[in-house]
Amino acid sequence: EKTEIDTRKEFQNKINEFPYDFSEVKGQETAKRAMEVAAAGGHNIILVGPPGSGKTMLAKRVPSILPPLTMKEALETTKIHSVAGKMGSNTSLMTVRPFRSPHHTISDVALVGGGTYPQPGEISLAHNGVLFLDELPEFKRAVLEVMRQPLEDREVTISRARFSVNYPSSFMLVASMNPSPSGYFPDDPNNTSSQTEMQRYMNKLSGPLLDRIDIHIEVQKVEFEQLAEKRKGESSIEIRDRVLKAREIQAKRYKELDINYNAQMGPKEIEKYCDLDS
């Protein structure tokens, strides 16, 4: 006898169990709106702000406003995690979008994949989900540079002498960084970072890499009055409802194309759908 399971409902229930919620973030309305726009279009985003401004809190809550996995996405994600040996003993199917947050000491092989028998790296384990790189300039520049091509192609090819392996890597990149080595520029009157140190700090990130990050948003420090407020902000469910509506509009727009959301558009689609004001 056949058993029918409404996987869409199952995935929806799983995302509602997410441990973090946007209502827990005090203030930062502009940054929250930027996160919503990024989630709606699948755009990469970088948060620039001082320590304690809530950059990591915001990033960890992005999966809670993303649409539930489709069955196709769930199977793709499950295959990758299974190949990497990352599936739990009691898990047969990935039902929530992955959130990967590697440490800044990670090697290039661990990030993009590799080894004698090529294994998926963090960018593939984040496929259909979120890759969070906290304190982006602390990563080795060479490690970040190998991520440029996968960001563009949404897949990574690992070549060996006798064969090559392709792993998908269509993820939403969320990055964060301080505005200066000391972390508090320009508000710190005793800023200890020299112009040379500031330039060296910013030079850790190449122009081509930053070009692949669609949204750059400044996150201001939250004043005590805002932190002390009892009123909660919008919940992740409320924000996700708007994200879902935006994704539905995009699905209709691109129904004849192999595109699901705005971030996947190429030059032809941009010319057709993005009528820029003069």
Locate predicted features.
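Peripheral, non-AAA+ core regions of ATP-driven protein-machinery
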Residues: 1-46, 53, 159
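Long, charged amphipathic helices and adjacent flexible linkers at domain junctions
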Residues: 2-22, 87-101, 243, 256
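Active-site phosphate-binding and catalytic loops of NTP-dependent enzymes
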Residues: 3-6, 47, 70-72, 85-90, ...
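Conserved alpha-helical scaffold flanking the Walker A/P-loop in AAA+ ATPase domains
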Residues: 36, 92-98, 108-131, 164
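Walker A/P-loop
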Residues: 46-88, 153
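The Walker A (P-loop) glycine that initiates the GxxxxGKT/S ATP-binding motif of P-loop NTPases
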Residues: 49, 113, 135
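Basic, amphipathic alpha-helical bundle interface domains used for macromolecular binding and assembly
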Residues: 118, 141-146, 150-278
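Walker B catalytic acidic pair
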Residues: 128, 134-136, 146
